[in-house]
Amino acid sequence: MFRRSKNNSYDTSQTKQRFSIKKFKFGAASVLIGLSFLGGVTQGNLNIFEESIVAASTIPGSAATLNTSITKNIQNGNAYIDLYDVKLGKIDPLQLIVLEQGFTAKYVFRQGTKYYGDVSQLQSTGRASLTYNIFGEDGLPHVKTDGQIDIVSVALTIYDSTTLRDKIEEVRTNANDPKWTEESRTEVLTGLDTIKTDIDNNPKTQTDIDSKIVEVNELEKLLVLSVPDKDKYDPTGGETTVPQGTPVSDKEITDLVKIPDGSKGVPTVVGDRPDTNVPGDHKVTVEVTYPDGTKDTVEVTVHVTPKPVPDKDKYDPTGGETTVPQGTPVSDKEITDLVKIPDGSKGVPTVVGDRPDTNVPGDHKVTVEVTYPDGTKDTVEVTVHVTPKPVPDKDKYDPTGGETTVPQGTPVSDKEITDLVKIPDGSKGVPTVVGDRPDTNVPGDHKVTVEVTYPDGTKDTVEVTVHVTPKPVPDKDKYDPTGGETTVPQGTPVSDKEITDLVKIPDGSKGVPTVVGDRPDTNVPGDHKVTVEVTYPDGTKDTVEVTVHVTPKPVPDKDKYDPTGGETTVPQGTPVSDKEITDLVKIPDGSKGVPTVVGDRPDTNVPGDHKVTVEVTYPDGTKDTVEVTVHVTPKPVPDKDKYDPTGGETTVPQGTPVSDKEITDLVKIPDGSKGVPTVVGDRPDTNVPGDHKVTVEVTYPDGTKDTVEVTVHVTPKPVPDKDKYDPTGGETTVPQGTPVSDKEITDLVKIPDGSKGVPTVVGDRPDTNVPGDHKVTVEVTYPDGTKDTVEVTVHVTPKPVPDKDKYDPTGGETTVPQGTPVSDKEITDLVKIPDGSKGVPTVVGDRPDTNVPGDHKVTVEVTYPDGTKDTVEVTVHVTPKPVPDKDKYDPTGGETTVPQGTPVSDKEITDLVKIPDGSKGVPTVVGDRPDTNVPGDHKVTVEVTYPDGTKDTVEVTVHVTPKPVPDKDKYDPTGKAQQVNGKGNKLPATGENATPFFNVAALTIISSVGLLSVSKKKED
C-alpha cells in the first residue's frame, strides 16, 4: 500500500490555479503544449491531445514505467484502485509509476466525461483512465526521442470493497457466537480470513467484489448450531444396599451413576442425602454437569435394610417404690423385687446405683439395670421413701448470741446479756447466763455462755460477746509533731503558711499548726527560730520550732564584668556576618558571656560608618550591651555606569541592503568614553517592509558593556491587486435537477470591499442532475489586470430515499416448549433492525399458538420515522412436550402360589412384575405384605418408578394354599361315657376331645369363617 501526496498542478480544487500557453522549441520543431493534459478535448482555444492507453513500459523513450511491485494496484499494465483505500487516505497516484532520476510527474483522472485532479474526488466504481505528464529536471515537459511530449495514460479499474468488508465483519461476529459448533465456526472464520487476505493483497473488479459478497453469504450458511451435551448423553442412576445406620458418602453415591464414555460429565449429589438410620428405599438426586455447562439429573437408590431389634427395645420394665422409717436398712433384693419385668423377657435386675441412705429422710432414687439374654440392658429407677424420726427442739431451732460495747468500768447485768440472745420465734426457748460474768474494768472482748432451755427439756448453748472499750488518751500524748526548716535569699519575705507548712503532723491526728513566736526578719542573714503551736481536736496542744535560714544576696554578672565593642573596615558591597561582628567584642576572661547581634545589620552597599548593637548574656541571665563599628569604604564606578550611549534610526526602500557599519554609525557614543560599537543582534531583512530593531553592543576600555537598539525603517514596494485581496468562493445547496446560472454562482464569491474585482465563471458548469459536490472555477479580474481564481461549491442533494429502502431488517427465530406463551415483546426482540434506522417493530400477524407443536410464522411490521414500513417474519419453533414415562409404558402384575406359612420377600414380589423393555422402571412394594400364615389370595400393591419420576401401580397376587391336615387332626377316637351320680356329666378331659360332634361342629364353624375370609378378600 502507499500514501497519498498532493498534486498541486492538477488539483482543480486549488484556488488561484492559472493556465497558460507556452511554445517550447525542441531541435527544429516547435510544439504547442496544453498544461491540463485532457487528451482529445478542446477547452477554450487549447488543443490538447492524449497518448494511447498502454503500459508505460511499452512507450519508447518514456521516463516513466509502471510500479509493478505494488501488486494490489498494478497488474498486466493496468491500474486498480479500491475506494475503501481512498477513504482511508492510502492511495497516492504518483506511487503507481517509477520515474527516472530527476523527473517529476503530474496526473489527472478521467471517468466518463468527468476529470479529477485528486484521487479523493473519485466516488463511483467502473472503468477510468489515469494520465501522467512527465517533466524533466528543468521543470519543462519531457520530450521523448520521437519528438512527442511524454504523456502516459493507464487503464484504471475502480472498485469498492467497503460493503464486502462490512459483511465479513458482520459474519465474523455471528460466527463467534458460542451457539455454533467449533468445527463450523473454524471453517467459516478460515474462509473469511482467506477472502480478506485476497482483497487486501490482490486487485479486483466490482464484479469480483460482488461475487465475494455471495461467497461470504454462503459461508455464513455453513454455521451449525451445537447440540447441548445433556441432549447427547443419557446417564443412569444405580442402586446399593446398606445395613441400617451405615453412612453413605457423596462419592459412594456418585460412583453408582453410569456416565457415557467421552461425555466428561461430572456427577454431584444435589438432593437430600439418605438417612440410613431409617430402613427402606431412599432416592438421592444426582446432577451430572457437562463441559458445556448443561446438566442431567438421575436418581440413585439406597436400599437400607433394617437391623434386628435388641431386647432392650422390645421390652419396657418399670421401677417400683417402697416406704421405710428413717434408719431402717433396705437390701438389694428388696429393691430388685420392686422392678416389674415383662413376662417372657427373661430380664435379670441388678442394683447398679448408690444404695439408699435410710438415715436420711426423703425420697431416694436407686438405679437398677435389667440385663436381657441378648446382652442388651435397660435402666429403671426404684424410689425408697424414708420417713423422718421426730426432731428434738434443740435440733429444730438455732439460737444465736449477740454482742454489745460498753466503756471500761461500766457494769453489765444478766438480763442485758440474755436480751442479746436471738431465739427463733415459736421455739419458746428460755435463756439463762451459766458462764462467768464479764469484768468490765478490763478492756477487751469478754465471752459469756448463755443456755437456752426448750419446752421438751432439750437445751442449746450460745455465746454473747461484751466489748469493753478503754478510757481515751489525750491527743498531745498520742502524737509527736516535728518542726522543719527552709532556706530563703536575703530580703525574701516568709508567710505564716510557708512556716506552718514546714511542720510535720502525724497522719490522722487532725492537728492544726499556728505561728505563736516572733516572725523571722529575712533582711538579716542567718538562722531564725520560729515557735509553732499544734492544736488537736480534743483541745490539747504541742509546741515545735521551725528554722528559717536566710542567705545573703549574690552580685549579678553584669555588675562584675565590663565588655567592650571593637571596629572593622570593609570595601563597599562586602557582606559582614554576625560572627564577624561578635568576634570584634572583647569579653572579660572567666565571665562566660555570650555575644549576640541585636541591632540592625550594617548595609555595606552604603559607604560610611555603621554602628551595630551587640548584647552579651552571662550565665546568671544578666546582660550587657556594647557597640561595634563597621567602616565601609566606597568602590570605583565602571564605565558602563558612567556613560549613556543611544541608538539612532534610518529609512531604506524594500530590498535595499544595510551594512553593519551603516548601523553602528547611527549609534551616539559620549565623548571621552572611548566606547566601540558592534552589531550583535540579527541583521535587518530589508526584503520585509516594516521596522527592524538591530541590537548594538558598546564595549568600554574597562571591559564593561552597554547595549542599544538601532531602528531600520523598510518602506514597502507597491503590491499588485491579486496579492492585496483574498476573495473566497462560497457554497450553495440545491435539490437534484435544479439548474444553477452563472450569476447565481458568481454571486456566491465574496470579493473584498474596495478591490473592484469582477467575477467570471471559467470552469465547467455543475451538472445538477448528478447528486454530490460540484466544484466551479470562478476568475476574479482586478482593475490592474491581475487575476485571482476561486472555487464555488454546489452541493446537489439527492432525492430523499425512503427509510424502508435504506434499511433491511431481518426476522429472527426462537424455540419454546409446547404450551409456553410468547409475548409480543419477545417476538419483536427477535427482529434485527439496522443501527441508526430508529425502526419500531410491531406484531401485525397472528400470534403463535404454542399449544400446537411445529414452526409458527409471525408477521412483524417495522415502522420508520418517515412513516414507511418494512415487513419481516419471525419463526417460533414449538417443541412438543415430552410424554411422561408412565403414559409410555404399561407394566403388569404377575402371580405366584406358595404353601401356607412360607414367607414371600419383596424381591420375589417385584420379580413378578413385567416391566416393558427400555423403560428402566424400578418396582417397589408399597402395599401390605401378604400374611402367608392365612391361606387364600393376597393382593400386593407394587409401584413402578420411571427415570422421569413418574410412577405406575400394579397388583401382584400371592395364592397361599392351606397346609394339609394331619390324620390326628382329622380323626377323634372316643372312650365310653361314664356316669357320675347317675347323671350324664363328663369326666374331666384327660387326653383327646371327648365327642366327635364337637370336633365336626368346630371344623364346620372354622371352615365357614375361613370361607368368609377368603370371600371377603376376593371382594376387597
Curated annotation (Swiss-Prot):
Signal peptide range in chain numbering: 1-41
One Pfam family named in its UniProt record: YSIRK_signal
Feature: compositional bias, Basic and acidic residues: 272-281, 354-363, 436-445, 518-527, 600-610, 682-692, 764-774, 846-856
Motif LPXTG sorting signal per UniProt: ranges: 987-991
Location(s), subcellular: Secreted, Cell wall
Renumbered residue ranges of the record's region 9 X 82 AA tandem repeats: 227-964
Bias kind Polar residues: ranges: 320-329, 402-411, 484-493, 566-575, 648-657, 730-739, 812-821, 894-903
Function: May play a role in both virulence and immunity.
Protein name: C protein alpha-antigen
Modified residue annotations for Pentaglycyl murein peptidoglycan amidated threonine: 990
Region (Disordered): 261-281, 306-330, 342-363, 388-445, 470-494, 506-527, 552-576, 588-610, 634-658, 670-692, 716-740, 752-774, 798-822, 834-856, 880-904, 962-989
Source organism per UniProt: Streptococcus agalactiae serotype Ia (strain ATCC 27591 / A909 / CDC SS700)
Propeptide, chain numbering: 991-1020
Origin: domain of life: Bacteria
Other known facts: Identical repeating units define protective epitopes and may play a role in generating phenotypic and genotypic diversity.
Record's bilayer topology term: Peptidoglycan-anchor
